[in-house]
Structure formats: C-alpha cells, structure tokens
Amino acid sequence: MFLRQSTSQVIRFGPALDKDDGVTEETSLTLAQGDMRLSKDGGAFAQKNASGNATHDSDGWYSTTLNTTDTDTCGILKLNVHQPANMLPIWETFYVVEETVYDAMFAASAKMDVNVKNINDQVITGDGGSGTEFQGA
C-alpha cells in the first residue's frame, strides 16, 4: 500500500490471530499506541507517534491513524503490531512516496509529469515546435 509523505491517514492491518491456536481471530483486543511499532526506511523500530488505540473493524482486522510524523520519511515503512500475551505478531509493509508522486498516481485529476529532459544520457534541446528537430547535446 502506498502512503502519501507527511500526511495523516488511516491504515488497516490484520488479521490478529490468537497466540495459542494461530487460527482464531482476535476481535476484542485493546491495541494501544505502544503495541504498534514502525520502522522508517530501515531505521530502528519505535512506537508510532500518533496517539490512540487501534479500532477493530471485522474478522480480526483493525485500523489506526498514522500522523504526519509517522509518514515523514520516504521509503519502506514497516508496521509491527504485537501483544505477546494475546496474539501472534502482525507485519505490514507500506511505501511512503512524495506528495507529488502520490497525487500523480491517486488524485482525481492524476497526471504524471512526462517532460523528457534526457534520453540515453543525452540532454534534449529544442522546443519541439513545428519544424524543430530535437538534438542531443
């Protein structure tokens, strides 16, 4: 899942499964801020910055909010949720991308910037107008 850099957003994770049988969905856990740990772009794990518990949705799936501090670093964002006394660990991977990249992919008026400046390591010159040939510099 892609996340927009430096943007507060709700994420989903799960299913939370019972630690004893590994099958039964845990639907009534109180997953606190300290139970949810993040690693930003390969950094050390630390509890998520956004306060608040996770909320159960259905079938062991939970949601929580990440704030702008949680999503301020581009790259892979790993989420680990674990309560050793109650559930098996959950691991989720998110990809934090710059705002312009996210908007180009998912905004209602999404348009990729396709301006070409180099081809085969050659700088493109010329304006592309009628009768103008593009030349490698």
Question: Each predicted region: which residue ranges?
Answer:
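Polar, enzyme-active/binding microenvironments
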Residues: 1-137
